[in-house]
């Protein structure tokens, strides 16, 4: 489960990170360290460049839902990073459906790598027996 870059705190500066490539590479390194123990990696993110980078690295081992994602490292359409955009009721409904699908799918996996988020916690609550860990080098974070 991979969030937008500003959710992660740079331990050197104690400020939010600004480099999405650093976030992607940290996540990929964490998955690379675990992938031999698993058949595949379920990539849960709303950010298309993150999906693209995972597919580039892990190829057919990547699993993800087929849906439209954000083209940039944005929090969510109409959210903090795009406050001038007003979502329609249909867009909100689709967003909620996608969130619930992601949480349900994550709760069915054998292991979750992620960071603090309501979705991460929801998946762990749905399956209290699942093993989990933080994305290495991204264990300092802000927001829920």
Where in this protein do the model-derived segments appear?
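A signal for specific C-terminal beta-sheet/loop modules enriched in small/flexible residues
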Residues: 61-84, 127-144
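N-terminal, helix-rich and Lys/Arg-enriched segments in bacterial and organellar proteins
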Residues: 39, 83-84, 123
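Residue-level detector of alpha-helix boundaries and kinks
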Residues: 39, 90-94, 108-109
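General secondary-structure edge motif
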Residues: 34, 85-86, 103-104
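Surface-exposed acidic, glycine/proline-enriched linker/cap segments
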Residues: 79-98
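Generic structural signal for short, solvent-exposed loop/turn connectors between secondary structure elements
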Residues: 34-39, 116, 141-144
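Core catalytic architecture of nucleotide-activated donor-dependent transferases building glycoconjugates
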Residues: 1-78, 97
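A donor-sugar binding/catalytic signature common to diverse glycosyltransferases
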Residues: 97-142
